[in-house]
Amino acid sequence: MKKLVIATRGSKLALWQAEHVKSCIEGQHPGVSVELLVLKTRGDIILDVPLAKVGGKGLFVKEIEEALLDGRADLAVHSMKDVPMELPEGLVLGIIPEREEPSDTFLSVHHDSLAALPHGATVGTSSLRRQSQLLALRPDLNVVSLRGNVDTRLRKLSEGQFDAIIMATAGMKRLGLSAPRSEVLGPPAFLPAVGQGALGIEFRADRADLHELLAFMEHTPTRIRVEAERGFLAGLQGGCQVPIAGHAVMTGDGTFALEGLVADLTGARVIRRTMNGVSAPDGAQARQIGLDLAAQLVADGAGEILAEVYGSGEAVN
């Protein structure tokens, strides 16, 4: 019996994702057993500070990647929106499975929708991207930081600390969670984070055996979409905690449309553009389209907006 070890965070959602991949592997390969190695990342430990102020990239993956490099684990399962643009040398995102719904969801106890919230209502989110888009739609809202795991966020909502909260639809669906009232916030009105709803399976580049073993999970349309979105984010020198949104959809066999957005923290300035492209299954051309779209937004003024967000006077270019 061949044994594999999956490195994962210990949150309910991370464990669901790792267990899902474990189940897929063992179902496809009866001669393989899979164990989980649960690790705490910096992002899991620092819970009293808004993510945007913690600083650094890879808040939810660094410790997991170290386990891959030192041999404690064979593979890791990540939420793609948490994976930095540059991977450590020797590691690859070898497999990207089929994507779940990439949208966000509005959750409330008393209000049916974002539009139904009273003037000045308090909305909780951990994301500057959501904050910017919320304020662009509803400048009157009081948007405040909301950290913690899924259960903690829903508990704070039910206790009345917030009139509403915004969470990723995929996480809610995967864990079978809901709130008394909800509304899907999706494209084109509300763009998701780059890679939101997609999983990535990371392992060492020299593990050709894993690439072969896990190839059945690869989903080419999802890889093309995710590579396009990640190219866009890379071109803006962004991480997962900036007011940048990107969403790609397949429009044909290998063809896609990518929409990108950059906003200031108040939602007063929003720059968004769309670009069409075509890509081979590995997503290389899609990534270049993402870079090209980023350059277009920078030319339109996105660099100045991001310079203000990053706290420097030097524009991204």
Curated annotation (Swiss-Prot):
Sorted UniProt keywords: Porphyrin biosynthesis, Transferase
Coiled coil feature spans: none
PTM-bearing positions, type S-(dipyrrolylmethanemethyl)cysteine: C240
Superkingdom of this protein's organism: Bacteria
First-level EC class: transferase
One GO term (biological process): protoporphyrinogen IX biosynthetic process
SUPFAM superfamilies (UniProt xref): Periplasmic binding protein-like II, Porphobilinogen deaminase (hydroxymethylbilane synthase), C-terminal domain
Signal sequence bounds: none
UniProt keyword annotation of Protein transport present: no
Catalysed reaction, written as an equation: 4 porphobilinogen + H2O = hydroxymethylbilane + 4 NH4(+)
Cysteine pairings via disulfide bonds: none
Pfam families attached to this UniProt entry: Porphobil_deam, Porphobil_deamC
EC nos: 2.5.1.61
Cofactor: record remark: Binds 1 dipyrromethane group covalently.
InterPro entries hit by this protein: HemC, Porphobilin_deaminase_cofac_BS, Porphobilin_deaminase_N, Porphobilinogen_deaminase_C, Porphobilinogen_deaminase_C_sf
Pathway: Porphyrin-containing compound metabolism; protoporphyrin-IX biosynthesis; coproporphyrinogen-III from 5-aminolevulinate: step 2/4
Gene Ontology molecular function, alphabetical: hydroxymethylbilane synthase activity
GO CC term (a single one): cytoplasm
Cofactor names: dipyrromethane
Presence of keyword Methyltransferase: no
Subunit structure: Monomer.
Function: Tetrapolymerization of the monopyrrole PBG into the hydroxymethylbilane pre-uroporphyrinogen in several discrete steps.
HAMAP family: Porphobil_deam (MF_00260)
Additional record remark: The porphobilinogen subunits are added to the dipyrromethane group.
Stated family: Belongs to the HMBS family.
Listed name of the protein: Porphobilinogen deaminase
Gene designation per UniProt: hemC
